């Protein structure tokens, strides 16, 4: 699979086969992540793999949103009016816990920070944050080339505090998201994407 095929194949799914991802495959995916550009050339990234169900149960402080009315109220509160966008959230919210607990591989990526992430002194202060997301995108594309799909989820503040205790990571490292990767279930739902043309997004010389 070439890079363009992997880009087309990469999709977000939240329903997985009951099948673990082999460590050799995980290492290849992380190695692809480590090939991403990095702001300081040091690639100060670390990865915690959590594949045991008991360990995941102890780690995760996430709940599925099972109430459709609650979900609709949340979307209204966000001011979402696009139906494709709303459908994405309707798909996601009831699976917030299950997509992480039942995945074939749960990866917790970490990156080293120089100053508090939510109190940057300048745009350049976010270079570390930008670099780890380049790494994560490489990993998602590598996973797609392996026949794996998945989802990322950004933790809430209370989740991050619990993860710090559960995993024991250093104070100067931050987890930007959970990465759940696995083999798609046969009935895995794949929400429709908005069709967007590159030509409509390109501006020559001026906006």
Q: PLM features: what roles do these ranges have?
A:
Residues 31-35, 90-95, 163-166, 188:
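Glycine-rich, charged/polar anion/phosphate-binding loops
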Residues 44-45, 103-106, 175-176:
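Short, surface-exposed beta-edge/turn micro-motifs
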Residues 13-28:
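A short N-terminal beta-strand-loop micro-motif at the entrance of redox/enzyme domains
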Residues 161-175:
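Short, electropositive alpha-helical surface patch
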């Amino acid at each position: 699979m070439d890079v363009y095929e992997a880009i087309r194949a990469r999709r977000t799914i939240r329903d997985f086969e009951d099948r673990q991802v082999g460590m050799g495959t995980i290492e290849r995916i992380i190695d692809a992540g480590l090939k991403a550009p990095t702001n300081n050339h040091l690639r100060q990234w670390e990865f915690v793999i959590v594949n045991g169900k008991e360990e995941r149960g102890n780690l995760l402080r996430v709940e599925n949103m099972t109430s459709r009315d609650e979900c609709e109220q949340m979307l209204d509160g966000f001011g979402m009016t696009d139906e494709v966008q709303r459908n994405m959230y309707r798909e996601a919210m009831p699976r917030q816990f299950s997509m992480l607990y039942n995945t074939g591989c749960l990866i917790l990526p970490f990156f080293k920070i120089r100053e508090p992430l939510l109190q940057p002194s300048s745009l350049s202060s976010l270079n570390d944050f930008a670099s780890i997301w380049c790494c994560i995108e490489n990993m998602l594309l590598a996973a797609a080339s392996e026949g794996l799909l998945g989802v990322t989820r950004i933790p809430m503040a209370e989740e991050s505090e619990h993860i710090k205790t559960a995993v024991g990571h250093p104070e100067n490292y931050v987890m930007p998201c959970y990465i759940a990767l696995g083999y798609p279930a046969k009935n895995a739902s794949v929400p429709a994407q908005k069709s967007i043309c590159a030509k409509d997004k390109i501006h020559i010389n001026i906006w």
